[in-house]
Amino acid sequence: MRFPSASDPGLLNVIDRYVTPAAQGVGRYLHLLHGNFARDDESERTPFLQALSTAAREITDDELEILLESEWRSRLTAAWLIGFDLREHFRDVLGDLLLASQLCFAGQGYCFALARFGTDEDAQHLAVYLDRYLRRPDCPYDQRWAISALLRIDSRTGSEHAARFLHPGGLWDQWNEAQGRRRPSPPSRFIDELCAHADEDAATRDPRSAPQDAGTAP
């Protein structure tokens, strides 16, 4: 793992350009963390998303790889940029990083990107993660992000990848009960909103680039 330090100016340069640029007085990664930008007023959210979209188009694959080798702030930001620009060739890299779950918070970005890609391949990565970590109540990592991402893919493709986790008494209920929730609630669909912001940006730039719902004519 590469840690930000004076001995690694290449990493510091990429972090300064893409991870820590300030918006409303705080670094970009803090707006991406937990999808915090979605709670901002539109007057603040719009310029933030415009800058994020520009960064997603400008950053090179090599620079993304540098960020994915670093700490959680860099990995989180890289994953959001990958998802925003639909760089699907990073799919397996993000899936492997999600399953490894080496760092806090970074998995949120991996789940967002896989949800944005929205294919059966992405669903498989999310399902493998959930099959492992819903059985680990001692590891409350990114299970909520992963199930939300999986539900988004199911809703757009007509698949039912999430169903085996959500039946009464199944892994989702068991994991929630182990977290101290007596009445497990259905998983939130919050990733739908986060992806909608990216879809709207894509449609604004090029209507042909916005993902189509399953069965919708291009």
Where are these regions (language model features)?
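Alpha-helix N-cap/helix-start positions at coil->helix boundaries
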Residues: 72-73, 103-105, 136-140
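Structural detector for internal amphipathic alpha-helices that build alpha-solenoid repeat scaffolds
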Residues: 35, 43-55, 76-86, 107-119, ...
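N-terminal alpha-helical scaffold/docking segments in eukaryotic complex subunits
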Residues: 1-59, 167-218
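Alpha-helical transmembrane segments with an aromatic anchor "belt"
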Residues: 81, 96-103
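Short, well-structured hydrophobic secondary-structure segments
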Residues: 63, 71-81, 89-90
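Amphipathic alpha-helical scaffolding segments comprising HEAT/armadillo-like alpha-solenoid repeats
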Residues: 56-67, 87-99, 120-133, 155-166, ...
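Accessory, usually C-terminal, subdomains that scaffold auxiliary metal cofactors
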Residues: 140-149, 153, 160-182
